[in-house]
Amino acid sequence: MIVVFTGGTGGSKLVQGLQQIVKPEELTVIVNTGDDLEWWGLHVSPDIDSVLYSLADLLSKDRGWGVEDDSFRCLERMTQLGQPSWFSLGDLDLATHLSRTAMLRAGKTLSEATTELAEKFGIRVRVLPMSDDRVSTLLDTATGRLTFQEYFVRERHQVEVRAVHLEGAEHSRPAPGVIESIERAEAIVFAPSNPVTSMGPILAVPGIRDALRRATAPVVAVSPIVGGAAVSGPAGALMKMMGWPSTLAGVATAYKDFLDILVADGADAQAISSQQSAVSPIASGDASASRSPIPDSRSAALRVVCTNTIMRSAADKRDLAEFVLNLCATPQGAEA
């Protein structure tokens, strides 16, 4: 079984690639819910929805979120009625949130609601929220404390962040199936999502990080940082706020106690080779990797590999997914 940890838009691209090459019953996707919010009285799970829409081939290719060819008549009317409208929901997208909210109010858990939505969309891949308990990502900024969506969407992540809080994380429990999936996995993949606000909430759920430390399967992360900057979104700025560099070394630090292999973009090969104190020279596009001494890493030295990680097409997604799984199948030390 292949287990993927992901946030929303960026990570869901790799999920689509894995979907092309892995049997659906052998793929489990564990998704961040720290971004969840109540909007117009509805429970919205942005990252789960991005994953579901991606797997169902419904995701808007132009926007990178929401449903393809959606209309926004309800949003227009809500704006006319004086309701908040900075968080855009399309009409078809609203149907998902209405359905989820109805199931939650009827007593179903978020896991159960997610499974039912996946079935209705014809998705056979197992999609799990990180927890059925509410965990909220809150950010202390120069303008006050904000929810993640207020920071990311309303403020366009342009305000300075001084601290990140994961409200409710300490009392949360992994959703049913999460720990079991980690224990049974043949490969564990961290998609190129924000290490602070996408992966951070997942890893803050008690029991998940410990399970990753104990995992017998190789743990591979695809870096969301290319050329010292985030491919999209505020990952770089948030990593610096955490005291991590906005580099491959910063990504490795975020996952240092369980990570075995870090996949970087080929654009970073030259920079890596010139900074041997951080990461040793590696061959672009080659599964034969050198090793980087990351303090307190799970293994004696982290294996770092370069390939193309920018996913613009279905072929790019498939190629990266194949590359990652081939790495997992390469025996430790085989590249020596």
Please describe what each predicted stretch is.
Residues 23-25, 215-219, 302:
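A short helix->loop->beta-strand "cap" motif at the edges of active sites that frequently abuts
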Residues 28-32, 218-225, 261-266:
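Short internal beta-strands
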Residues 32-166:
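Electropositive, gly/pro-rich neighborhoods at or near active sites that engage anionic ligands
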Residues 34-35, 215-232, 309-311:
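Short, flexible loop segments at boundaries between secondary-structure elements
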Residues 162-182:
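Active-site glycine-rich loop that binds ribose-phosphate moieties when present
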Residues 201-209:
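Charged helix-capping and loop-helix junction motifs
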Residues 232-272, 300-336:
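C-terminal functional extensions of proteins
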Residues 270-285, 289-301, 333-336:
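Short, basic, low-complexity termini and linkers enriched in Ser/Thr/Gly/Pro
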